[in-house]
């Protein structure tokens, strides 16, 4: 299960999606989320799904990486579907046992919510899969740079977010190593009910926290050795510049978001 968590991982490539400016990808993700949460009909969901499919195919990220990233949230997806099935009012499917508690409106709501969660996760994961942590930090800093006038530490905030995102795969790998070492000593993490499994994970927490603090200390030492002083006087080796492709992609996602909002108000 731990190996299925792919959030924060970066898959290098030279595709159009990889070469896009990180600011473009961040803005496109925001527009994509706006479009997704305003989708209410089969037509609008199909439009969002089509755009997501084009992005995935263009990025050449293997489908197994995306589906593997969905495995840890299967329980959340199933819980959401069940809640919508049984607790959405409307016309019952049939007057027979459990079916009397399931409505046609609940079925539609469950399908819509499951699709929304899956497409939301796949769309946001695609951002980290195709954008390196350094590029993501630079993009966030440039997008939020107007807030520097309010004396907000934008560079530090962007750096913190990037480091936190980058440490997710590292901590997952460390947890997997600790669990393997515990299993070699006779620990059992797979048998018993959910409470027994949770109790079995307690011995992992102490070495995991120690490892996390040690890595944080090593990172802080490395940054100090390189005379890191935040964003003060910092320059970039590769200056971010919008290209024609960035404007075209941004325009396409803007049209998608506005178009779906219009279709929503038209009842389509």
Segments (PLM) and residue ranges:
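Membrane-helix interfacial "entry" motifs
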Residues: 14, 37, 61-65, 97, ...
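Juxtamembrane/interface alpha-helical elements of multi-pass membrane proteins
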Residues: 70-187, 194
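Alpha-helical transmembrane segments and their helix-start/interface "positive-inside/aromatic belt" motifs
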Residues: 25, 64-74, 246-249
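Transmembrane alpha-helix interface motif
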Residues: 1-44, 48-59, 142-145, 149-152, ...
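A general structural signal for short secondary-structure boundary/capping elements
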Residues: 63, 79-84, 99-102, 227, ...
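Extended cationic-aromatic binding surfaces that line active-site or macromolecule-binding grooves
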Residues: 55-59, 64, 72-76, 80
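Transmembrane helix-loop junctions in multipass membrane proteins, especially transporters and channels
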Residues: 41, 45, 60-64, 88-96, ...
């Amino acid at each position: 299960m731990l190996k299925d968590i792919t959030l924060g991982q970066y898959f290098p490539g030279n595709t159009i999606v990889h070469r896009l400016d990180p600011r473009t990808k961040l803005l496109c993700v925001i527009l994509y989320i706006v479009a997704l949460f305003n989708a209410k009909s089969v037509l609008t969901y199909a439009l969002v799904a089509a755009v997501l499919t084009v992005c995935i195919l263009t990025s050449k990220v293997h489908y197994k990486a995306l589906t593997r990233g969905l495995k840890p949230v299967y329980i959340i997806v199933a819980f959401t579907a069940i809640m919508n099935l049984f607790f959405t009012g409307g016309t019952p499917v049939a007057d027979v046992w459990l079916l009397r508690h399931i409505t046609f409106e609940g079925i539609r709501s469950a399908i819509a919510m499951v699709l929304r969660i899956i497409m939301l996760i796949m769309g946001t994961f695609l951002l980290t899969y195709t954008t390196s942590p350094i590029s993501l930090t630079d993009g966030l800093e440039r997008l939020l740079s107007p807030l520097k006038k309010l004396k907000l530490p934008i560079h530090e905030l962007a750096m913190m977010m990037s480091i936190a995102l980058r440490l997710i795969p590292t901590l997952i790998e460390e947890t997997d190593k600790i669990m393997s070492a515990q299993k070699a000593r006779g620990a059992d993490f797979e048998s018993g009910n959910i409470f027994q499994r949770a109790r079995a994970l307690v011995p992992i927490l102490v070495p995991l926290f120690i490892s996390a603090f040690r890595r944080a200390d090593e990172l802080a030492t490395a940054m100090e050795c390189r005379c890191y002083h935040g964003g003060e006087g910092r320059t970039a080796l590769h200056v971010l510049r919008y290209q024609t492709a960035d404007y075209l992609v941004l325009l396409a996602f803007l049209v998608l978001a506005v178009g779906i909002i219009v279709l929503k108000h038209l009842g389509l």
